[in-house]
Amino acid sequence: MLKRVGHPVDEKGAAVAIKDATFPVPFAPGLEFNSPVHGNWNIVHTGMLMPEARQIYVCADNCMRGVVLTAAEMNVADRFSFVIVKEENLLNGNLEDITIEGVTDVLNKLEEKPKAVLLFTVCLHHFLGCDLERVYQELEERFPKITFIRCYMDPIMQKHGPTPDQKLRKAIYEPLPKRKADEKAVSFLGSDFALEKNADLKRIVRAHQGIFRELPGCKSWEDYLAL
């Protein structure tokens, strides 16, 4: 049935007044619109803190929009790749193969291989029961010189555990090798930005002739491993 343009829309059930909102779930869980925008700081920004690493996202077009915008905004498209998952890939039940072969194709086309790959799987991998152990094992066998970091872009799962951002912040430090403690060195972890030169922590370390290390200040893979 056609409706006159400009006809008043009944928002009952579709909107909640601020005075009626309840914490922590102001809206009843249901179908939600995915806005084609990105936040001020997201998983792409955090992942780009790792030097000499490449981010690869395996997901559908809809989920790809925000991260692509971020990579373009940061001017780091040369460190960003993606594998598009289509409907037939879901129906055929071969998401593992699509992920493995897609990532392999991306890496084979690179003239210079990255030291690490932050591989982002998504909600679809959870829904379809994708064997991620097989995916990572196969990729590690094909590219033994590359460190594969397990990352997730699965916000639909965040009500049942850590958010994608929290999981990423943990994952980017997992490749660090265990080394003998250096009593003269201090590693400052978790910050998105390098501390100012005259920050209190840096001044204290310098006063004791120490070495101050932080991820945002790493320029090479060797710098990262020294953390």
Regions from the language model: what does each represent?
Residues 1-227:
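An N-terminal assembly and electron-transfer interface module characteristic of large anaerobic redox
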